[in-house]
A protein has these predicted regions:
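Structured alpha/beta reader/binder surfaces that contact nucleic acids or chromatin modification marks
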Residues: 1-8, 184
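Charged, terminal alpha-helix-loop-beta segments
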Residues: 12-249
Length: 249
């Protein structure tokens, strides 16, 4: 290993956080892990139908265990996030976690046309992650799909805010771009398409809004050769549904 970008950062961040559960790994991390395992097993394909995969600590390789996989017997009913999200929105309560879950669940599924059009614009999702760790300081990208359009790949770091946008959001997005450029792009060549999604600003004539737009333009100028211009998307509630709109600034 000659460079930090060769490390499997998703697994390292998982250990640093000390959490248990599902941890998403990127496409290139999955491919690399698969090849490492394949090499360790002398490129022998394992036929483990109706058996469980296990690890032989003595031989230091993956084996087929003579026992059947466990069946999941927990809750299976679908959870409808939208009513909870709308209730919190109307009550003025925090709902960023619900917004993140809604986008992660529905993006690219054809269930919210405005969501798909503003973020994907006809592209296909090849990978989708949320709470993507991107630094030893425990920073995490809210949602990050990798998409394909016209044979061109783009990685889309999305910053979500359940409130109106402000200038500080650009600082966070800049950190995402820095990390992706240093650790993700060397392993998976892609365009970088930063996106900011926030609650709709009704009055766009204020001095604060002008400052916000100026911060977007400064970001675009300083990162012109590194990523695509920032896409600014606002959401609102229309007829008991979430509506997303791309803002021209």
């Amino acid at each position: 290993m000659t460079s930090p970008n060769q490390m499997l950062w998703s697994l390292i961040y998982r250990k640093l956080k000390g959490n248990r559960g599902n941890t998403m790994i990127t496409v290139y991390e999955a491919e690399r892990l698969t090849q490492i395992i394949r090499n360790k097993n002398n490129r022998t394909e394992l036929n483990c139908e109706n058996k469980m995969l296990s690890f032989d600590s003595n031989a230091q390789k993956i084996i087929c265990a003579d026992r059947r996989p466990n069946s999941y017997v927990g809750r299976k009913e679908e959870i409808n996030l939208l009513p909870r999200l709308i209730a919190k929105y109307q009550a003025g309560n925090s709902f960023e976690a619900h917004l993140q879950a809604y986008i992660t669940k529905n993006l690219g599924e054809g269930k919210n046309r405005s969501l798909d059009e503003t973020i994907l614009d006809g592209a296909e999702i090849e990978w989708l992650g949320n709470e993507v760790s991107c630094g030893v300081g425990m920073q995490r990208i809210d949602v990050m799909p990798s998409i394909m359009k016209n044979s061109q790949r783009a990685v889309v770091p999305i910053e979500l805010k359940a409130v109106e946008a402000d200038e500080r959001n650009v600082i966070q997005i800049q950190r995402y771009v820095d990390w992706i450029e240093q650790y993700y792009i060397p392993n998976c060549q892609s365009d970088i398409q930063p996106v900011l999604i926030t609650k709709k600003i009704e009055d766009k004539t204020t001095n604060n809004y002008r400052k916000l737009v100026n911060s977007f333009n400064r970001f675009n100028q300083t990162t012109n050769s590194r990523c695509n211009p920032l896409v600014f998307i606002e959401f609102s509630i229309i007829r008991n549904d979430l509506f997303f709109e791309k803002v021209t600034y």
